[in-house]
């Protein structure tokens, strides 16, 4: 019988161990304790971070939102029907990231950045964190460049600047989305990249928005992030942050971007749903205590950053350029109640609001902008010179008209001055009306405002103000194209432009019909 040498045995074992090809991974692993309504409770994940991605079997991911003493509450990103009690859950050591870059322009993606438009994969894109800290005070620059929405009522009375947060607020079906979409359409030649985030909307509505942007040639410089009503609350909650990260890509590289959140009321509802399922204590209107922070940390990321910030971020690749991300958040009110919890929160966070009123909309004044309640806190410094010069009396005329119209209902006879003021107010109200998907250029807008400001509408019938304006703009674009081009390029207002407009309108009124 052959004798085995103990040293040989150890050599054989050692050789086998050396040849064994095993890649070991040190991972924090836990067990799923319960699964319900998209919320998973996990036991045993001791080292998990807040907001960390958690991997489940079958390539399903979750996000840790509740870190408790003996368990972790996570929200599942996507379908949770394949998960069951007893399954393993692993920490990934990563926080949620989404694709960013110019490859996303013209595409429709979900809240995680996956394309959903059937146009194939995105290609090689960078990724960036969904949750980021807003630029500090030192890196910011004041707002002094305009974002033209193409609406007279907005650009004349409630101007929006690059890097501003301007809230669009009003009841349902009143033209909030229409205003935001027109603002995006108006950017197709302005060099501003756009991001449209649809939260909790019908898929047919999102498809309609995509079609309209495509028809108007604005889809090529727009990213659409869609978290429709059929998506889980987790994705509806994350969509605005994902869209913001995509917009910040342009801001941080010295470009200008515009982001529309449509709408943040539905994001707050989705977050409330998640919080209640995670058993967090409810507060006012059953919203969790941090619902203000939900919106403030999102909207603070919209800003205008300095040349130094862009240079530092790009490691000197881009110099001498400021970047901006302008936000147009939308909030839906119930029966015009702006004092509800979420509307008051967002009003206090933003730099002004455009208030759309049901009564005006129903009486045919569209866009239904209530100039009295609407305000732009920083946009005045960014307004185009010619619009600023000519729009001074418009807001006053409308405010006085509304005040006098209320008194005129009770007065039997009015003096001449009051009657003139009322008629001027009616004409200005007519002039502020504008068709959907027809944003105006600076020159067209300036011409309309000039006609109102300098009294050229006084002898025009109130019912014919709209047709007068259309005919006047068509006449100037045909016979005074050079003057209009000059206004569009420079946006200045001087004696030559004043004289040119005056002479042109006088000739138009003498020779043309409308």
Curated annotation (Swiss-Prot):
It is found in: Cell inner membrane. The keyword Membrane applies. It is a peripheral membrane protein. Its EC number is 7.1.2.2. Belongs to the ATPase alpha/beta chains family. Produces ATP from ADP in the presence of a proton gradient across the membrane. The alpha chain is a regulatory subunit. This is ATP synthase subunit alpha. ATP binds at residues 170-177. The record marks 374 as: Required for activity. It is an enzyme of class 7 (translocase). PROSITE patterns: ATPASE_ALPHA_BETA (PS00152). Keywords: ATP synthesis, ATP-binding, Cell inner membrane, Cell membrane, CF(1), Hydrogen ion transport, Ion transport, Membrane, Nucleotide-binding, Translocase, Transport. It catalyses: ATP + H2O + 4 H(+)(in) = ADP + phosphate + 5 H(+)(out). GO terms for molecular function: ADP binding; ATP binding; proton-transporting ATP synthase activity, rotational mechanism. One of its GO terms (cellular component) is plasma membrane. Pfam families: ATP-synt_ab, ATP-synt_ab_C, ATP-synt_ab_N. F-type ATPases have 2 components, CF(1) - the catalytic core - and CF(0) - the membrane proton channel. CF(1) has five subunits: alpha(3), beta(3), gamma(1), delta(1), epsilon(1). CF(0) has three main subunits: a(1), b(2) and c(9-12). The alpha and beta chains form an alternating ring which encloses part of the gamma chain. CF(1) is attached to CF(0) by a central stalk formed by the gamma and epsilon chains, while a peripheral stalk is formed by the delta and b chains. Its main location: membrane.
């Amino acid at each position: 019988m052959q004798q085995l040498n103990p040293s040989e045995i150890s050599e054989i074992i050692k050789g086998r161990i050396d040849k064994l090809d095993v890649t070991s991974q040190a991972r924090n692993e836990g067990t799923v304790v319960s699964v319900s309504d998209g919320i998973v409770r996990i036991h045993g994940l001791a080292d998990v971070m807040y907001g960390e991605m958690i991997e489940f079997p079958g390539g399903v991911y979750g996000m840790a939102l509740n870190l408790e003493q003996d368990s972790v509450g996570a929200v599942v990103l996507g379908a949770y029907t394949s998960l069951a009690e007893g399954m393993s859950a692993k920490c990934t050591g990563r926080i949620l990231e989404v694709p960013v870059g110019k490859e996303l322009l013209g595409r429709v993606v979900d809240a995680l950045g996956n394309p959903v438009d059937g146009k194939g994969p995105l290609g090689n894109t960078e990724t960036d964190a969904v949750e980021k800290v807003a630029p500090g005070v030192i890196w910011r620059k004041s707002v002094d460049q305009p974002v033209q929405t193409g609406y007279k009522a907005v650009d004349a009375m409630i101007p929006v600047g690059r890097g501003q947060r301007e809230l669009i607020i009003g009841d349902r079906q009143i033209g909030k989305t229409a205003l935001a979409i027109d603002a995006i359409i108006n950017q197709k030649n302005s060099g501003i990249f756009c991001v449209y985030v649809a939260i909790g909307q019908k898929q047919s509505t999102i498809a309609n928005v995509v079609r309209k942007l495509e028809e108007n040639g604005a889809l090529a410089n727009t990213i659409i992030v869609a978290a429709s009503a059929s998506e889980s609350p987790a994705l509806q909650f994350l969509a605005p942050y994902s869209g913001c990260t995509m917009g910040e890509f342009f801001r941080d590289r010295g470009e200008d971007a515009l982001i529309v959140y449509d709408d943040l009321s539905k994001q707050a509802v989705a977050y409330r749903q998640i919080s209640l399922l995670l058993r967090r204590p409810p507060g006012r209107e059953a919203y969790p205590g941090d619902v203000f922070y939900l919106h403030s940390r999102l909207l603070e990321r919209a800003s205008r950053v300095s040349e130094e910030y862009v240079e530092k971020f790009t490691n000197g690749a881009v110099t001498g350029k400021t970047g901006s991300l302008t936000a147009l958040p939308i909030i839906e009110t119930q029966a015009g109640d702006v004092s509800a919890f979420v509307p008051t929160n967002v009003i206090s966070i933003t730099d002004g609001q455009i208030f759309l009123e049901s009564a005006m909309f129903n009486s045919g004044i569209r866009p239904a902008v209530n100039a009295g309640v609407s305000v732009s806190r920083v946009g005045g410094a960014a307004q185009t010179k010619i619009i600023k010069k000519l729009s001074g009396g418009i807001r006053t005329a409308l405010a006085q008209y509304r005040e006098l119209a209320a008194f005129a209902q009770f007065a039997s006879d009015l003096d001449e001055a009051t009657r003139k003021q009322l008629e001027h107010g009616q004409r200005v109200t007519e002039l502020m009306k504008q068709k959907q998907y027809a944003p105006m250029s600076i020159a067209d807008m300036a011409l309309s405002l000039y006609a109102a400001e300098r009294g050229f509408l006084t002898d025009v019938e109130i019912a014919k103000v709209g047709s007068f304006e259309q005919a006047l703009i068509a006449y100037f674009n045909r016979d005074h194209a050079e003057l209009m081009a000059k206004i569009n390029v420079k946006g200045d207002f001087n004696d030559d432009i004043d004289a040119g407009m005056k002479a042109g309108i006088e000739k138009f009124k003498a020779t043309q019909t409308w």
